[in-house]
């Protein structure tokens, strides 16, 4: 996911929530 947050914004947001 890292480096592809633009293509996986939904997934990226989930990871940010985890942090």
UniProtKB/Swiss-Prot annotation:
GO terms for cellular component: extracellular region. Thrombin-like snake venom serine protease that cleaves alpha-chain of fibrinogen (FGA) releasing fibrinopeptide A. Has high clotting activity. It comes from the Eukaryota. This is Thrombin-like enzyme calobin-2. Expressed by the venom gland. It is an enzyme of class 3 (hydrolase). Keywords: Blood coagulation cascade activating toxin, Glycoprotein, Hemostasis impairing toxin, Hydrolase, Protease, Secreted, Serine protease, Toxin. Optimum pH is 8. Residues 1-19 form the Peptidase S1 domain. Its EC number is 3.4.21.-.
């Amino acid at each position: 996911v890292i480096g592809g947050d633009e293509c996986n914004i939904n997934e990226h947001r989930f990871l940010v929530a985890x942090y």
